[in-house]
Amino acid sequence: MKKYQRMHLIFIRQYIKQIMEYKVDFVVGVLGVFLTQGLNLLFLNVIFQHIPSLEGWSFQEIAFIYGFSLIPKGLDHLFFDNLWALGQRLVRKGEFDKYLTRPINPLFHILVETFQIDALGELLVGGILLGTTVTSIAWTLPKFLLFLVCIPFATLIYTSLKIATASIAFWTKQSGAMIYIFYMFNDFAKYPISIYNSFLRWLISFIVPFAFTAYYPASYFLQDKDVIFNIGGLILISLAFFVISLKLWDRGLDSYESAGS
């Protein structure tokens, strides 16, 4: 474990050195993400100027859900975004072969090879929103500790879904479109799922479970709703999807044939 931690830090340092050679691109990337999320919030604020609540949720509560959703999304984007490359080009162009010739677990290598620093924009917006809305929560020590526990498990859902959909490329040569389709469901997690129809609520809860990355844990923190389902469900589903994604990765790796073979 320590060996992999050291290697991860080495990859991060090397990638940051590369990024710092193009400082303008870095600043533009972070600002772009920051402005995108800011415009979404501005639109939401405009809506709440005309209505007092949305399905019983106040603007402050929805802002907390929105901010909460950006933290695991931003962490996954920051550390594990290279899975997009697997789905889009590594298998199709035969570039995946190099990962099989090195004395490193290929999945670990792909996960830590890049460091998407523009994700800091998402983390910054998420942090600001959480910082300005936490006063609406009656915090206790157990609740605060559960909040800290939720973040890595919510991040694991993002990463697991990307591992699973990226692994499809081992059979189809590319799966970028599939990753994109599944990943876009995360937008629904930024708002209370009670505003959606029953089918969509079921879909984003148990098939593409992004609702567990924000809405369900936020329901516990904001309204003290069912800790077993909202927090326990997050932990159980994230671990289940991680195991499934690893199984799919292993099956795909066994079926892999180089694009040049």
Feature annotation, model-predicted:
Residues 1-261:
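Hydrophobic transmembrane alpha-helices and immediately adjacent juxtamembrane helices
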